[in-house]
Amino acid sequence: MSGHSKWATIKRKKAATDQKRGNLFTKLVKEITIAAKMGGGDPSGNPRLRLAIDTARANSMPMDNIQRAIKKGTGELEGATYEEITYEGYGPGGIAIIIETATDNRNRTVADIRHLMSRSGGSLGENGSVGWMFNRKGSIEVPKSAISEDDLMELLLDAGLEELESDDEQYYTVLTDVKDLEPVKKALEEAEIPFENAKMDMIPDNYVELDVEDARKALKLIDALENSDDAQAVYSNMDISESVMSALEEE
């Protein structure tokens, strides 16, 4: 199984138990607000806002909450002013970690991130220290039960498919150039093919395989980072083998 597909599988398992809905809604509201502030409140002309709204709706956020977040972004309602800051560093086993945040207090945020990294044996680095190891891509998961691999590839090639990973037992992972995420989503929608987790992702060039001890520490660190108040997304280049995952699940 490729590192990206394996990590996607791990994240799905984690999401079922780790993500508190209130915390998730807070992150989604921030993303909608920032997207509306940067590109306007009309999702038809603002792909980032449209993606944020789609994600919020997929997670059962009420439309009232979505509309309020948009209006805070456009200035129609008062709200906090968020600044987007990306932090980079190293975690257990030497894995590279990128933390994307949205904050109204950068001093608080960097202190929180540094504390979480250092207590787990990691370290916060300078901007660019690990970012060069990753590429930003569009990412979509398509259930294997919905379509064959050949048919999916044929459907999406002209829309902007860059890579199709099929190692996961339940999902294909569709990777696109950033600019092609929306056309690929549209192609799936028009063909009435279900999909999940359409998002911008950071895909590492190479992966670092962890042993049981480092994997345990790394998963704990990423959980803590993902659940910190200001983190919007966390990416890493860690790879965890099936045997290590099985050992962790038995603990």
From Swiss-Prot:
SUPFAM superfamilies: YebC-like. It is found in: Cytoplasm. Its main location: cytoplasm. GO terms for molecular function: DNA binding. The keyword Calcium does not apply. InterPro entries: Integrase-like_N, TACO1_YebC-like_2nd/3rd_dom, TACO1_YebC_N, Transcrip_reg_TACO1-like, Transcrip_reg_TACO1-like_dom3, YebC-like. Coiled coil: none annotated. It comes from the Bacteria. The keyword Transcription regulation applies. GO terms for biological process: regulation of DNA-templated transcription. One of its GO terms (cellular component) is cytosol. This is Probable transcriptional regulatory protein Cpar_0525.
